[in-house]
Swiss-Prot record:
Species name: Caenorhabditis elegans
Stored InterPro entries: T19C3.2-like
Protein name: Uncharacterized protein T19C3.2
Domain of life: Eukaryota
Length: 218
């Protein structure tokens, strides 16, 4: 889904920009912080598939071009140049395994990119990667996505998906990232997996996406 794809993205670029002791900080604070002089408008919702022609494009091609968008931003240029093949392989895998066409799983996000930025200041206040994101506005995507059934519904990691230019140490950390939670649903027509993106997990009875217990205070 788009959300855990974004987390995967942030990790790879962050790995290059920061030392390992700072990796956990990179996953937080994806806001339009004051350490960037200007921020682009929020882009269109990025999604895997569906009737909209935009959603049939690659991840990078769904981002708006020019200064009003994120496609040519330094963050995404580095990402595409260094790991473009890996990301296309990963995104194609998600697209192929997801059968839901409507946005779901709390996975569809919008991006905004900062310009004239610096990294001075507390890591909890600044946005060190200059990319902000938010859940797609005005869309109810609380239902867990329907995905192709796989034993135990553990869709990731998948060693069959090739990720060129990803080092072994990076691969190990990516494989352990908890960015997708899935549970089985057994239907008369056949079993499927129901999935939500971090920080959500599917309720095994209602298949609604709920905040993970350690985040909801339960």
């Amino acid at each position: 889904m788009t959300r855990h794809f974004a987390i995967f993205t942030v990790f790879l670029v962050g790995f290059v920009l920061y030392s390992e002791c700072q990796i956990s900080a990179m996953f937080g604070n994806p806001i339009q912080a004051a350490n960037c002089e200007t921020w682009s408008e929020w882009g269109p919702c990025v999604w895997l598939k569906g009737k909209e022609k935009r959603w049939q494009r690659t991840y990078f091609e769904q981002l708006l071009p020019g200064r009003k968008g994120c496609r040519n931003h330094v963050f995404f240029r580095l990402l595409k140049d260094r790991w473009g093949v890996a990301f296309n392989n990963f995104y194609t895998y998600l697209r192929d395994t997801t059968t839901s066409e409507e946005q779901c799983g709390e996975c569809s996000y919008q991006q905004s990119c900062g310009r004239k930025c610096h990294r001075r200041g507390d890591i909890g206040i600044i946005n060190p990667l200059f990319v902000a994101e938010r859940k797609c506005m005005g869309v109810d995507q609380s239902k867990a996505c329907v995905s192709t059934f796989k034993q135990d519904c553990k869709l990731w990691p998948n060693p069959e998906i090739k990720l060129p230019n990803v080092t072994e140490s990076m691969q190990q950390i990516i494989d352990n990232l908890d960015y997708l939670q899935c549970v089985p649903e057994h239907r008369p027509s056949g079993s499927v997996c129901r999935c939500c993106c971090h920080p959500y997990t599917p309720n095994p009875q209602t298949f609604e996406c709920e905040l993970k217990p350690y985040l909801s205070g339960k």
